[in-house]
């Protein structure tokens, strides 16, 4: 017979697996639709019209029209496409289900149109809202927080293709003063994360790792080099942190989301022309292209890092629906490659991984997630001790510093209760 503790853990196992599978399927469907639309906008249409897909007029035109389209969705859809991601953490309160259709449409348009944001925040919002709404009907005795945790764990597993990230994140958020052992509380979330990751793996495998030269043995000087790289990435990220609320306030003085997002899309188009097609979209596929292109110089990597960081700030400040983690990883890769080109004596594995650690730490203020992203992009077990050590001064630098988030005006609710 099972111990009562084991039976308690098993109670939410079936709902956890169902939520994990559903979280992954929602992500897969959204990404597939966005991919089809992206192919139409950036491959078939310009080919049919006889226009180069990387021509300035096409890049500016598509991104401007994308901004206008997203603005129309936010303006006229019920619930106004959910809360503004610039004002929200990755895992937030559930929104009314009525806001979800508009949010999904706005996300798909942004992903396909080349906006420099990832899918993580809107997908998380959708999955949490559905899990809470459906779970409250089927199992009303389970509180909303439990459904929120299961949905967010399933989404994290689906996004990254592994339950490891969820285990790391929730090991700190669930480690309270309760007498219930930590792994008892992690059991159901990890079931959801594993189900989400396995379901994603049936359809495609998220490819984060980069073909970077293997790092052999850690030296004492490497720790200093890594800490300096992380500090440079943090400094770049804090510039974005300073700019975001100010640009957000300036853009939203216009009040009309169609105008705000249209202007935001136009600015993103100009940035895309300067940075080229590799600086567009969420950044995961593009960072693979960036590493594969041997023609890039130090100045090219620097330009890509600056353009992508600026595009991330503009997209978030304008109100596009999307997440900031994936484009931040692109910025980290560009910074790391730039620093390696500038100082070849420092291995690229160190510069890239430590730059990712620093910039993701600025964006998320989550040490485990930052370590995870650095470790999966540059998969090398020799780097893990170095990354853990470099995390310490990086965390000290950010202690008490503002987060990459806009404080919501007090008179505005987080979302429309319609």
Swiss-Prot record:
This is Putative ion-transport protein YfeO. The keyword Transport applies. CDD domains: Voltage_gated_ClC. InterPro entries: Chloride_channel_YfeO, Cl-channel_core, ClC, ClC-type_chloride_channel. It is a multi-pass membrane protein. Its main location: membrane. It comes from Shigella sonnei (strain Ss046). Keywords: Cell membrane, Ion channel, Ion transport, Membrane, Transmembrane, Transmembrane helix, Transport. Pfam families: Voltage_CLC. The chain crosses the membrane at residues 10-30, 54-74, 99-119, 120-140, 149-169, 186-206, 223-243, 258-278, 300-320, 322-342, 343-363, 371-391. It is found in: Cell membrane. GO terms for cellular component: plasma membrane. One of its GO terms (molecular function) is monoatomic ion channel activity. NCBIfam families: PRK03655.1 (NF002971). SUPFAM superfamilies: Clc chloride channel. It comes from the Bacteria. Belongs to the chloride channel (TC 2.A.49) family.
């Amino acid at each position: 017979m099972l111990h009562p503790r084991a039976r308690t853990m098993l109670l939410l196992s079936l709902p956890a697996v169902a939520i994990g599978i559903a979280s992954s399927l929602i992500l897969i469907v959204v990404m597939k639709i966005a991919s089809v639309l992206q192919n139409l906008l950036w491959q078939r249409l310009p080919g049919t019209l006889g226009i180069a897909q990387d021509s300035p007029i096409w890049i500016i035109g598509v991104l401007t029209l994308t901004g206008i389209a997203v603005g129309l969705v936010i303006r006229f859809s019920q619930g106004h496409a959910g809360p503004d991601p610039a004002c929200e953490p990755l895992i937030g309160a559930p929104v009314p289900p009525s806001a979800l259709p508009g949010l999904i449409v706005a996300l798909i348009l942004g992903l396909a149109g080349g906006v420099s944001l990832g899918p993580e925040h809107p997908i998380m919002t959708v999955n949490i809202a559905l899990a809470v709404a459906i779970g409250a009907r089927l199992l009303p005795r389970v509180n909303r927080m439990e459904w929120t945790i299961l949905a967010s764990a399933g989404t994290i597993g689906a996004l990254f293709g592994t339950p490891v990230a969820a285990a790391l994140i929730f090991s700190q958020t669930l480690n309270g003063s309760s007498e219930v052992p930590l792994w008892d509380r992690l059991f159901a979330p990890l079931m959801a994360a594993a189900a989400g990751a396995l379901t994603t793996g049936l359809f495609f495998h998220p490819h984060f790792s980069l073909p970077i030269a293997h790092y052999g043995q850690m030296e004492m000087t490497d720790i200093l080099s890594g800490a300096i790289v992380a500090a440079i990435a943090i400094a770049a990220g804090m510039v974005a942190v300073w700019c975001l609320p100010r640009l957000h306030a300036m853009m939203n003085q216009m009040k009309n989301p169609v105008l705000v997002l249209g202007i935001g899309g136009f600015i993103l188009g100009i940035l895309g022309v300067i940075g080229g097609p590799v600086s567009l979209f969420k950044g995961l596929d593009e960072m693979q292209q960036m590493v594969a292109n041997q023609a890039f110089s130090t100045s090219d990597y620097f330009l890509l890092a600056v353009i992508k960081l600026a595009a991330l700030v503009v997209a978030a400040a304008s109100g596009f629906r999307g997440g900031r983690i994936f484009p931040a990883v692109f910025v980290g890769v560009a910074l790391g490659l730039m620093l390696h080109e500038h100082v070849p004596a420092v291995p690229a594995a160190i510069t890239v991984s430590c730059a990712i650690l620093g910039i993701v730490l600025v964006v998320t203020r989550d040490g485990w997630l930052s370590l995870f992203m650095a470790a999966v992009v540059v998969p090398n077990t020799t780097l893990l001790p170095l990354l853990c050590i470099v995390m310490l001064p990086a965390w000290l630098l950010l202690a008490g510093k503002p987060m990459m988030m806009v404080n919501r005006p007090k008179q505005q609710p987080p979302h429309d209760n319609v």
